[in-house]
Every structure is written in C-alpha cells, then in structure tokens.
C-alpha cells in the first residue's frame, strides 16, 4: 500500500537549501566575441514559433472536422442574440411589466384638474356677472387654445351625461322592477350572452382591466358599471357573473340603452338626474368647505404666532411709554411748583412778611415750655418786690393773663395790697389798649391787602405769563437731577405758613383755656 503524500501532526516549516549559484569562471576567450551565442538564441525562438503555429493549425483542422460551421460568426450572430433575449425573458418572468397603480392615479389627477378648472370658470363667471355692463364696450379676445379647451370641456360634459343616463338605465337599484335582471337570464339562455367559467373569470378580469387601462373609453366604463350592477343582482339569486366579449357587450349596452331610453326621458329619469347632480354639487361644496376650513385654521395659527410676537413687542413699547409719561409728568409738576413759588414770593408784600414774623414770634411764646416757664416766673413774682411785679405785669402779654384760671386770679388779688393793685390796673389798661390797637391795625392791613390785590391782579397775571415763559425756557436747560428748592422758595413757604397761622389766630372769637 503506497503512502499518501499528506502529512499529519506538527509540521514545522523547513528552509530549503538555496541552490548555490554557479561561480563564473574566468574564461580565457571571454572578451573575444558574442556572435555564436546570439545566433543560437534566435534559432531557438524561431523553432518555438513554428511549433506553436503547427499546433494551432492542427487544432483548427480538428474543430472543422467536428463542426464545419464553427468559424462562421456572421451567420450565427442573429441566433445567438435571440437565445440571449429568450434567456433574459425567462429570468425576468414574462414580457414587459405594466404598472399596477399609476394609471388610476393619473386618471384621478386628471379628474381633479378638470374639477379645478370648472371651479375657476364658475368663479370667473360670477366676477363677470358682478361687473355687469362695466366692460361691455370693450373688445373680447379669445385664443384658439381657450376655444379648444372649451370644446373639450363641452364634450366631457356630454360624455358624463351619457354615462349617467346609461348608468341610470342599467342600474338595477334605480329600476322599478327586475326586468333588466331577467333580460340577462333570457340573453344567457338564448345564447346572446356567454356564461363565463369560474376558472377563467380571474383571467378575463385581468384582460379587461388591461384593456381599460390602454383605452379608457365610455363603452368600457359602461361595461364595468354593467358588470357591477349584475354582480349586485346575482348575489340574491345565483352566483353567476356575466363577463362577455367586447363586441357583444357593446351591442348589449346599446340595445339596453335603446330599451330604457323612454324611462330616462320620462319625469322619473329627470328627477334622478337632478338628484345625482345635487349630490355631486353637494360633494364639491363639502370639499371646498373643508379646504376653506383648513386654510382658515392655517391662517389662525399664523395669526396667533404673529399676535404672540406682537404682544411681546407691544408690552415692551407700553412699558417704555409709561416710563416716558411718568418722566414728563414729574417734569410738569416740578415746573408748576416752581411757578407757584415764584408767584407767591412776588405776591407777598412787606406787610405780609412782617405779619408772618410776628405770628412766628407769638407761636414761639405760646409753646408749652414757655407757658411752664411763665408759671414759674409768676410764683417767683409773688415773692419779689412791687416794682419787679409791676415790670413783669407790663412785660407780660395779655394772652398769658387770659390763660390763667379764675382761681389764680382771685388768689393774686387777695394777696396783693391796694397800693400794689393800682400799678397792676394801669398795666392791664395799657395792655388792653395795646391789644385793641393791634387788632385794629390787623383789620386795616387786611382791607389794604384786599384792595391792593384786586388792583394789581391784572398786572401780575401779565407779568406771570411772561415770567413763566422765560422760566420754562430756563428750566428746560436745567438738568433733571438739579436741586429745585432754593433759600428764597423755603423762606417764602415759611412766610406763607406763618401768615396762615396768624390769620387763623386772629379770626378766633374765643379764648382757649389751659388746665393746670
């Protein structure tokens, strides 16, 4: 048994021993000439070429012996191409494949385009009716393309009308009796219509759909609707569905149309036609309404977005406007206060200022601390000499005496001697006279003020207008944060306050009693 050349186990690669190159031995005649070696090489090449040519010739002879037409390419090329096409058809699985859904989609697109054109035409017609006789004198231009379009539209309407009439005539649901249904039975029994086989039904459906896709004529649509009507009627009776050839179907459709034409011409047919048109118009209106609602929703969405953006911008503008109004209002108030201060300062006469100062002095004298101090001085005066008492009574204001209670006055009268009472009575008399003089002078001053105010009122108003214009021009130059109150405004405000207090005190007809 011969051992196989296959090895098993661990095989380690072994380096083959490299063949030692033959050493070039130096030749005595090496450099003489190379003619002999070159002639040998060329002879060797020629021999190899002759050998190859001889071998190819032998192979060609052998092939020709086997098949004489092996080298006739032009004659065989057409057959080779046919074989290639057949193989490709087998691989692809049949002839050219036709699209399944695109024809229906294209048909639906065409219908939608036509509906849109009709809507546009109605809209244009309404606009023309609204215009009335406005452009009646103008010349109307109609192109040939538009005329062609109108012609096609008219043909389309007529075709739809014919289809609707045919459908109304052939539809079992729209017929009063089952005469059309039984006519199919009669035609099938007589032999005018061929009863289709159940097995060939699917194939015929496929062929009819292909034919309809190739040429969507009104007759094919009528056949399809007729077959649908028959299928509805056959569900009640038998499971026989009529599918017949194209010529017989056309003849039958024409015959049925002729038979049912009296019914379509009658009032009942007109009523059905009207109902169908109303349903169609209603569907168009619903579609238009849905589109209008969708557009309205889109518009409202865009409006909401814009309104949100506008509200943000409007809020910023409103806040900025409020700030500007507040600043302008503050500026106006300051200008008004400055004008009033200037007017009051100018209106106040020297007499008013003197009266304000006197009222300030009296108010200081009437403070609680001063009254307490006066009481202490009264007690000290009892212990003092008659001269001091007389001086104190002279210096003392009538208001202090008025402030004393009746008990204190009686006690003082009892304590005093007759000699002491005489100078006191004189002092009281002088004080009363002084008070009367003061009240008279105040009344005179008030009357003088009223008369002077009434006289100078007109002149002051004119001056005030000029001064306010000048002051407003100057105040506009003043900074917003500048100090508005000056020494003059403060003093004028104080003087006015004192004048009011003094007038209030003078107008009182009673004396306020102070409790101990």
UniProtKB/Swiss-Prot annotation:
Chain intervals with Low complexity compositional bias: 207-221
Position of the signal peptide: none
InterPro entries, A to Z: Nsrp1, NSRP1_N
GO biological process: regulation of alternative mRNA splicing, via spliceosome
Disordered: region residues: 1-43, 111-137, 151-170, 188-494
Compositional bias of kind Basic and acidic residues: 222-239, 271-466
One Pfam family per UniProt: NSRP1_N
Phosphoserine: residues carrying this PTM: 33
Record key words, sorted: Coiled coil, Phosphoprotein
Domain of life the protein comes from: Eukaryota
Family of this protein: Belongs to the NSRP1 family.
Protein's name according to its UniProt entry: Nuclear speckle splicing regulatory protein 1
Species annotation: Danio rerio
